[in-house]
């Protein structure tokens, strides 16, 4: 897929790691890199798996890696609670890095949104608007939910997420956190967090201009996992030192 080709481009330009093989429904070759139809077809179960497939593919990758002692970076969105439970079980046996968005910039946005939530202390209404290409299947995006969950955690869990305002004709409640989705064209990924007060609006924005940022983050995560003990790791763990300066 597109992320697979982007990963090949990014990793090929580095000297601290290399691609052993790829996995895709269509087996074949990308340059000198063999591509297999499934993880089970790999000649050797070694290295670190980076997964950008689908919820079903992510669950399978987590189970395969747990069974073969392979660390994994799982980047797909749209996972159910049952899917996430499988991922957490895998993390008991191998290092698992999980994030719905591998962009370092998005994770800085999340930290800034946390800080703003604390500073405004419930005095501002909060809305999240996410925009993606017309082929994206899940809505709202996994990233929008990551942002909402971080805000809600900072606020003590008081917010109720509202996704569809047209079904109810009533004024906005103080405990609502609205999440709106836009799908169109080739938008890679835009996220805006709006803190709306009576006299002013503060907007924190992130715009992904290409898929390269996601690939870079995934490679950094794989390098971070090298040598880690089994466990469930996130961007917060990887960026802990840098986040302290915010």
Model region roles, listed by residue range:
Residues 59-68, 75-98, 104-116:
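Rossmann-fold NAD(P)-binding glycine/threonine-rich loop
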Residues 42-50, 66-72:
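Short acidic/histidine-rich motifs immediately flanking catalytic phosphotransfer sites
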Residues 53-54, 77, 181-183:
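Short glycine-/small-residue-rich Rossmann-like dinucleotide-binding loops
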Residues 19, 35, 72-73, 96-98:
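Hydrophobic beta-strand scaffold residues
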Residues 2-43, 122-246:
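C-terminal substrate-binding/catalytic lobe of Rossmann-fold NAD(P)-dependent oxidoreductases
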């Amino acid at each position: 897929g597109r992320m697979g080709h982007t990963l090949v481009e990014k990793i090929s330009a580095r000297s601290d790691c290399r691609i052993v093989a790829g996995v895709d429904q269509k087996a074949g070759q990308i340059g000198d890199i063999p591509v297999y139809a499934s993880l089970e077809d790999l000649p050797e179960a070694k290295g670190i798996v980076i997964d950008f497939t689908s919820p079903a593919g992510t669950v399978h990758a987590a189970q395969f890696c747990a069974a073969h002692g392979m660390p994994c970076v799982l980047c797909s969105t749209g996972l159910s609670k049952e899917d996430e439970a499988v991922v957490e079980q895998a993390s008991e046996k191998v290092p698992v890095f999980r994030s719905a968005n591998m962009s370092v910039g998005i994770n800085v946005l999340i930290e800034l949104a946390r800080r703003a939530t604390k500073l405004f202390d419930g005095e501002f209404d909060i809305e999240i608007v996410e925009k993606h290409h017309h082929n994206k299947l899940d809505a709202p995006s996994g990233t929008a939910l990551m942002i909402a969950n971080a805000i809600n955690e900072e606020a003590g869990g008081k917010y109720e997420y509202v996704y569809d305002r047209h079904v109810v004709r009533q004024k906005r409640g103080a405990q609502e956190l609205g999440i709106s989705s836009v799908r169109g064209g080739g938008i890679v990924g835009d996220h805006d967090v709006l803190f709306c007060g009576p006299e002013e609006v503060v907007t924190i924005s992130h715009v992904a201009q290409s898929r390269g940022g996601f690939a870079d983050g995934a490679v950094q995560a794989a390098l971070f996992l090298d040598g880690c003990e089994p466990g469930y790791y996130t961007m917060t763990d990887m960026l802990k030192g840098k986040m302290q300066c915010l």
